[in-house]
A protein has these predicted regions:
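Crotonase-fold acyl-CoA enzyme core
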Residues: 100-216, 243, 248, 253-256, ...
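Amphipathic alpha-helical segments at domain termini/boundaries
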Residues: 2-28, 32, 175-209, 217-229, ...
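Hydrophobic alpha-helical membrane-association signature
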Residues: 40-43, 91-94, 124, 197, ...
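Glycine- (often His-adjacent) and acidic-residue-rich active-site loop
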Residues: 56, 64-100, 117, 145-147, ...
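Terminal peptide-recognition signature
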Residues: 25, 29, 44, 62, ...
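Conserved CoA-thioester-binding segment of acyl-CoA-metabolizing enzymes
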Residues: 1-65, 100
Length: 269
């Protein structure tokens, strides 16, 4: 029986850097290609939950340290012989909560996939609003080939990006594909050389941070929930969102800035 490894200090498994309203979160387990341990999920959970109390953050970039983004779940960090059903259930629920926090974050999230992204690691990236991926990165959702199952929401996030036919190919055949393929299929927004991924992701985050926060939040919410509504319900939801935006100071600022031919200064209210 393998003895469980001592827990990693939470402050070390996730790095934070905030600059000009952009919060960069770096998965920091490069010795394991950023495989996601329970400690890393816990830190992500707490940090993402704190965004509602950090009004200065206007966008988030999520990336990985070293040569990989994340190669998936790291249950070995806890000792293979020590895993029981209770631990597995807690781990899965925690992973699902983190993916939902990314999808429902109060600010947009850009995944900077700087290298390989597999399984739970790719699930994290798919939960983001936008994705920039290294052209040469290898991506895979291998669960059905391993006799396990995906649990991070890809049955929704993947077909929402690439359509049902391509999602079936990716999930049922469990093949590796490249970052260049991901961009060609619409899974990622851009494919760049690995050295350019973080800078390109930050550029997207800066563009997002310059948008009107209330309008941006309404757009993200509606895009996420639109597949569950009828066309008439979507029109009604858009009308309600439009009315809410019209009540904000940013609505007035946007119109004034347009007429004055200057960049708008939005305050999120």
């Amino acid at each position: 029986m393998t003895s469980p490894a001592p827990p990693e200090p939470e402050a070390e498994v996730l790095l934070e850097h905030e600059e000009d309203g952009i919060l960069t979160l770096t998965l920091n387990r490069p010795h394991r290609l950023n495989a996601v341990s329970q400690e890393l999920y816990l830190r992500l959970d707490r940090t993402l939950a704190s965004l509602r109390r950090r009004p200065g953050v206007r966008a988030v970039v999520l990336t990985g340290a070293g040569r990989g983004f994340s190669v998936g779940a790291d249950l070995k960090a806890h000792g293979e012989g020590e895993l029981d059903d209770t631990f597995r259930a807690r781990y899965i629920l925690l992973a699902q909560r983190v993916n939902l926090r990314i999808q429902r974050a109060p600010v947009p999230v850009v995944a900077a996939v700087n290298g390989h992204a597999v399984g739970a690691g790719l699930e994290l990236a798919l939960s983001a609003d936008l994705m920039v991926v290294a052209e040469e990165a290898k991506l895979r959702l291998p669960e059905v080939a391993l006799g396990t199952f995906f649990g991070g929401g890809v049955s929704y996030t993947l077909p929402a990006r690439v359509g049902l036919a391509r999602a079936r190919e990716i999930l049922l055949l469990a093949r590796f594909f490249s970052g260049a393929d991901a961009a060609a299929w619409g899974l990622a927004n851009e494919a760049r050389p690995a050295a350019q991924v973080l800078a390109a992701s930050r550029e997207l985050a800066e563009e997002l941070a310059a948008m009107a926060p209330v309008s941006l939040r309404q757009a993200r919410d509606l895009l996420r929930s639109a597949p569950h509504r009828s066309p008439a319900e979507n029109l009604r939801a858009e009308g309600e969102a439009l009315f809410r935006c019209m009540q904000t100071e940013d609505w007035k600022e946007g119109i004034e800035a347009f007429h004055d031919r200057r960049p708008p200064r939005y305050h999120g209210r």
